[in-house]
Amino acid sequence: MSIKIENLNHIYMPKTPFEKIALNNINCEIEDGEFVALIGHTGSGKSTFIQHLNGLLSPTSGNIIVDGVNIADKKVKLSDIRKKVGLVFQYPEYQLFEETIEKDIEYGPRNLGISEEEISKRVKKSMEMVGLDYETYKDKSPFDLSGGQKRRVAIAGVIAMEPKVLILDEPTAGLDPKGREDILAQIRLLHKEYGMTIIMVSHSMEDVAKIADRVIVMNSGEIVLDGKIAEVFKEVETLEKIGLAVPQVTYLIRELRNKGFNISEEIFTISQAKEALLEIIRNNN
């Protein structure tokens, strides 16, 4: 299932003294099964953009074609689109409200009018998909969990709707290092094992380098760069001009290259750097 964006514009409070252009002529296509990271500094238009993808915001102009349907058309039933495109907001654990984890996750599917058997099946499957054992956690209060576990419950609640596309707005924000790694591992699993299309908003270049296939960089409501990790992260000067940076390890690799080390410039994670440096040591010995 693809999402195609054509000449998308969004203006907040148009024709008033407070008019603000949030999105300016956005064009891109997200293919079925892709893992796309969306990066940009605060105010670049990332959150506004993703809220158009399942109809939470309507465009001022332009087209958003989801699975062949232009959701900018006012005749389109947006509830059908939201079953296909799930959106997990930043700090989604603040939206947990039920007595037990099972009840919280089943809230969305229960509103679809499906059978009790199907609801139960979806809850169990979604908990498994985010790494929470059903029997262990189903009767626990979501408020007794760690921050990372709460976030997994919130993500499971969206997954239980069985979307084809999952959009995550800063999924690791506010988590400690372990919680951060756990969430990234589960997102990676959703993509690789379950074939889900993932669109992830992030400020962390390190997170993006670890798990995304493609990066879209936004600035002032426009797409500045769009390509594979290696293509985008080579544009160091362009990224720095708009207040961003490549992963710290990449700066280290650039310095080593400048000092004459024969090492690939396409190194963006610590594990990649470790392997490359070990290879240099082995060759020198």
Swiss-Prot record:
Family stated for the protein in its record: Belongs to the ABC transporter superfamily. Energy-coupling factor EcfA family.
Protein source organism: Clostridium perfringens (strain 13 / Type A)
Residue sites binding ATP per the record: 40-47
Main location group: membrane
Subunit structure comment from the entry: Forms a stable energy-coupling factor (ECF) transporter complex composed of 2 membrane-embedded substrate-binding proteins (S component), 2 ATP-binding proteins (A component) and 2 transmembrane proteins (T component).
Purpose of the protein: ATP-binding (A) component of a common energy-coupling factor (ECF) ABC-transporter complex. Unlike classic ABC transporters this ECF transporter provides the energy necessary to transport a number of different substrates.
CDD domains per UniProt: ABC_cobalt_CbiO_domain1 (cd03225)
InterPro entries, A to Z: AAA+_ATPase, ABC_transporter-like_ATP-bd, ABC_transporter-like_CS, ABC_transpr_CbiO/EcfA_su, ECF_ABC_transporter_ATP-bd, EcfA2, P-loop_NTPase
Top-level taxon in the UniProt lineage: Bacteria
GO MF terms held by the record: ATP binding; ATP hydrolysis activity; ATPase-coupled transmembrane transporter activity
Pfam families from the UniProt entry: ABC_tran (PF00005)
Membrane-spanning intervals of the chain: none
Record-listed E.C. numbers: 7.-.-.-
Keywords assigned by UniProt, alphabetized: ATP-binding, Cell membrane, Membrane, Nucleotide-binding, Translocase, Transport
Domain ABC transporter: 3-245
PANTHER family noted in UniProt: ENERGY-COUPLING FACTOR TRANSPORTER ATP-BINDING PROTEIN ECFA2 (PTHR43553:SF27), HEAVY METAL TRANSPORTER (PTHR43553)
Membrane topology, as annotated: Peripheral membrane protein
Gene Ontology terms: cellular component: ATP-binding cassette (ABC) transporter complex
Subcellular compartments: Cell membrane
Protein name from the UniProt record: Energy-coupling factor transporter ATP-binding protein EcfA2
